[in-house]
Amino acid sequence: MDRVQYEPTPMKSVSMRANNTRREFFSKSKGGPMVWRNLFFPTEILNALGVKMLTLETYAALFARNYKRTKKALDIAAYKGFAGETCSFLRVLEGTELPQPAFGVSTSQPCQQGERIFQDLARQYNFTDRFYSLHTPINADDPYSVDQIAEGLQEAVYLMEKALGMKMDPARLAEACELSNQAAELSKRCNELRWTSPPLIRGAEGVYSAVLFSQLWGRQELIDIQKQFHDELCRKKEWAEKHYRIEDTHRLLWLHLPPFYDTKVLDYIETVCNAPIVFEEVNFVDWDRLDPADPYRSLARKLLTVGYLDPKLRVHYILETAKKAQLNGCILYNHGFGRCSLSDSCFAKHLREELDNVGLPLLTLDGDCMDPTTDPCSTLTKISSFTESLNAKKFGNMFGRIKGA
């Protein structure tokens, strides 16, 4: 079969995301007080409060393609005592000069190592008395979890109000929840289009949008981006269905994060092996609508059900997505060679057992999202072997669909 093609019109939503990222992370405008956050503390709260936020893991990832800068940061972190067993995202943060914050917020799960590093950074930047760690249980079924997290979120807001001399406007928080709902609904519609169509965009494009981790939840900008993206997907669906049926191609799911320093691995999968990645876990949106009249409990439920805190729930989401999207394979990128709790051996074992039950193969790729020097030489060989086995199962030979067949 010839290489899978895509509707060629450049996507405006990509440039909209890029422009927003530049404004969010590199703008010199003062805005409100700077608040550091980790990937999971609700942005709806920070956007409603009117602060300027910095998502630390995202900030680190933005420098991954600047190898000299990343290497320098990793070297500085090593000099400070942080060796390879520490996550490379966190080592980059330890080795980078960060904007001075007025406050910091984080969550105890899912990355406990990140929590310890953030507390160390708070000590270095002299704001330990203005750092709040939200204790986050991982069991979404626990009847006390929602109340516990909701109380923690309210406490975080109280402490920020006190430290920053600001006051949360309940009307603005309610508005942020409603804006978040609109963006979530658009995101779900985008996902449904991708699940029920031939490949619409390359996974190498989709995975870097990572809407789940956007700072824009609770703002109009995310609605505008997702509306534009939805319109583009509709156009691409119309084109794709004239050229392919869903069953004509492989349909892979990418799990966890990608390498941020280049797209070599993703390109090899999709271009050389002709195996489209039709969806990415970092774009999965399926939480309940937020209740603007009960924002803290709603955001607590969202945090519990976003998919990354509870491994059992995460595996359930993957299985449900596999069914809806008619997947025939999954790829888990094992950032940190098993040191990251989001792709470690326990999770991989759990996931593999459940996927085996439904006959869906899983490829685990060891690697590092930030440090290309640790990339195993066997990665491309493993991908080739995996896609050859998919070809044999789907097309009856290891090379893929034969022309005219």
Region locations from a protein language model:
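C-terminal hydrophobic structural anchor segments
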Residues: 315-359, 363
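Peripheral docking tails and interdomain loops at the edges
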Residues: 347-405
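Glycine-rich, highly charged phosphate/nucleotide-binding loops
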Residues: 76-95, 306-320
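A charged, amphipathic alpha-helical module
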Residues: 1-33, 150, 154, 158-289, ...
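Redox- and metal-dependent alpha/beta enzyme cores, enriched for Fe-S-associated oxidoreductases
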Residues: 40, 45-70, 253-319, 323
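Acidic/His-rich segments in extracytoplasmic proteins that coordinate ligands and/or metal ions
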Residues: 88-159
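Metallocofactor- and cofactor-centric catalytic cores in central/energy metabolism, strongly enriched
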Residues: 2, 15-27, 35-37, 43-44, ...
